[in-house]
UniProtKB/Swiss-Prot annotation:
It comes from the Eukaryota. The lineage of its organism: Eukaryota, Metazoa, Chordata, Craniata, Vertebrata. It catalyses: guanosine 3',5'-bis(diphosphate) + H2O = GDP + diphosphate + H(+). CDD domains: HDc. It is an enzyme of class 3 (hydrolase). It comes from Homo sapiens. The keyword Repeat does not apply. One of its GO terms (molecular function) is guanosine-3',5'-bis(diphosphate) 3'-diphosphatase activity. Keywords: Acetylation, Hydrolase, Manganese, Metal-binding. This is Guanosine-3',5'-bis(diphosphate) 3'-pyrophosphohydrolase MESH1. Residues 32-127 form the HD domain. SMART domains: HDc.
Length: 179
């Protein structure tokens, strides 16, 4: 498929097209694509990750869950390895929200190393965003509940990447939580 830079740009372009109508829940209505790009940036800049499969999966991690993208489509464009990682980090939206959250906690320790990296960076991005501003319609109590749930997920991802884990521990400590 060409150079790694070209592969990364293909994934970014694909994600941007798939998420083009979506916005984050922040007061500014930030374009959703900022999130997967931010997750990939955390992996490269803070965790030192250069694995192209992990970075592509980071860019694509919400496409199947939040758009009309299928896993077969991901595999067709980006290969079986990227598909497997995206599949690992994708929640089954046919399940109730509480069940999806429970499964994330339960499955975290059994995830592949690449999926663990994407999950850590995803949680770090989301928690930083929650510290920056409260999403539309969220109470401070709901924000704290999200932090508490995220701490349970992250606990199962320990031993994956020291830099990401330390950054997360710092955020949890600010909220009175330990992992």
């Amino acid at each position: 498929m060409g150079s790694e830079a070209a592969q990364l740009l293909e994934a970014a372009d694909f994600a941007a097209r798939k998420h083009r109508q979506q916005r984050r829940k922040d007061p500014e209505g930030t374009p959703y694509i900022n999130h997967p790009i931010g997750v990939a940036r955390i992996l490269t800049h803070e965790a030192g990750i250069t694995d192209i499969v992990v970075l592509q999966a980071a860019l694509l991690h919400d496409t199947v869950e939040d758009t009309d993208t299928t896993l077969d489509e991901v595999e067709l464009h980006f290969g079986a390895q990227v598909r497997r990682l995206v599949e690992e980090v994708t929640d089954d939206k046919t399940l109730p929200k509480l069940e999806r959250k429970r499964l994330q906690v339960e499955q975290a320790p059994h995830s592949s190393p690449g999926a663990k990296l994407v999950k850590l960076a995803d949680k770090l991005y989301n928690l930083r965003d929650l510290n920056r501003c409260t999403p539309e319609g969220w109470s401070e109590h709901r924000v704290q509940e999200y932090f508490e749930w995220a701490a349970q997920v992250v606990k199962g991802l320990q031993g994956t990447n020291r830099q990401l884990e330390e950054a997360l521990k710092h955020l949890f400590k600010q909220r009175g939580l330990t992992i």
